[in-house]
């Protein structure tokens, strides 16, 4: 806004139009015959007091086509302006030449006392012929065709210069205008702010609707209170914090995308009114809070007054945003740690599988060697042990041992899913989980864990997470149908997902039907995301029903009872007792019930023994055999020694008998001495 003292001057000019003004056009010789005199139209529109208000550029776009052709620059003459004495007396300090279709500035003689000069809405291309107006304070050249700022060096008293809507490309030739208070350059083609650092008294600078891409070089404008930069191409702002008196800054409709590009505004202590509307930054959800947080002294934002409630919210939101950032950073760290841990677990798993494959190959080679005493379970050579290192690849073994123990497993609860990575994660089932957490888990995922190790913790899983209904297996070495038997000990399974990666069992065509048959008491709903239908259950029974019957019929009764749990032993005994009854005696309902119980019992005989458990049993059998062998060997040795002693006795006995008889005869040959000897022995014994 222009100071009131200039506003009043322009107002008077608007109300007191110079209606008696004469223009005299003459050649350079100034001869009387070449003079042409004409009078300006008395209905000339008054000067509307146009200043640097924010609507200065409102009609800019609509006026672009209003220009008409310029007077040829080769024209040798300038219009000469002359006014009567009466007019000079009435309007001594102002002159309005608005909308006169002027292409050049006329020569103004005898008007050195002018303080206001208005050339609005003409076709002037160059500022000239006004250097003699050294008392001029207000110069309005709005809406002309000026391409360069010139001809102003002598106007040292000029306070208001309005050059809006011209063709100026560069700010220049303002060195002598040190008293300039208002400078309007809106609607031009300026690309850079320059040559204004000496304007220490400038209070209003309007550069709206130009081609500025950045704002800087504002040092020295110590009195600037208003800066209008609307409708440019500005991407960043600098040096605004060096303007100690700046109160209003208008940056609407530019290309500002972040607060960092205008961060210098936060350092300004004088700004009270600022606009960002029409910028990409104004579309962001954090825009208003960020601006208010960094510029607490603002009174208006985007032409709207800032309330105390908005300030309060702005002071709270940053704390929440900071907490969100910290939480986001924490989550990022956790995700990265999770990723690294999973990669480490996967690498360890891969090394284990390669070591196991090498061990398996070595075992096959050993089996092709000369016959040795053996008693093995199929697949029992999958596990690799440290003592076999001599036959394993040394590089793989050392790499496996080099992995950190703390990085080889991961336990994660995400919503309703418990994810376990690595065999060490199974130890989490020994923790004291809260009732709420344990009850929330419905899905358990096993990754990079041997299935045989999982089997050992299934009873704990059933107790710790009673609501687990969905099991996922990925990279768990599920290689045969028999392994699915181990899942029967769980309480309930509604869904089962077996990832093909690391589980060769899914390559079997009928594996899903076997799962449905063996785990029929669970009434599963989905397998690998596919709904289970009644036809699937019927097909599973047809394919594998005979298998359970054969398995149960081949087992002795004592083995059957040992396999069944206590809860099923009574059912099994009931079935055995019912075999002797006639079919007609038992009602149809009872028969169906027994048949159902029998089917479950038959399926129970299809169990799974882990390789580790089998190896333990195998070692136990070997120990028993060894004990029996040693015991028998000791008995044989003892019997042999007894026999040898008996044979030696038989050889020595005849001679010993003769000696005994001889000693007895000699001893009793003297009856008295023999009796004394006997009495003496009796006495000695007492």
Swiss-Prot record:
Residues 319-341 form a coiled coil. LRR repeats lie at residues 113-134, 135-156, 157-178, 179-200, 201-222, 223-244, 245-266. SMART domains: LRR_SD22 (SM00365), LRR_TYP (SM00369). Residues 279-317 form the LRRCT domain. The keyword tRNA processing does not apply. It is found in: Cytoplasm, Cytoskeleton; Cytoplasm, Cytoskeleton, Microtubule organizing center, Centrosome, Centriolar satellite. GO terms for cellular component: centriolar satellite; cytosol; microtubule. The keyword Coiled coil applies. Residues 311-332, 359-381 are annotated as: Disordered. Disulfide bonds: none annotated. Keywords: Coiled coil, Cytoplasm, Cytoskeleton, Leucine-rich repeat, Microtubule, Repeat. PANTHER family: LEUCINE-RICH REPEAT-CONTAINING PROTEIN 49 (PTHR45973:SF8), PROTEIN PHOSPHATASE 1 REGULATORY SUBUNIT SDS22-RELATED (PTHR45973). Subunit of the tubulin polyglutamylase complex (TPGC). The complex mediates cilia and flagella polyglutamylation which is essential for their biogenesis and motility. Part of the neuronal tubulin polyglutamylase complex which contains TPGS1, TPGS2, TTLL1, LRRC49 and NICN1. Interacts with PCM1; TTLL1, TPGS1, TPGS2 and LRRC49. This is Leucine-rich repeat-containing protein 49. It comes from Mus musculus.
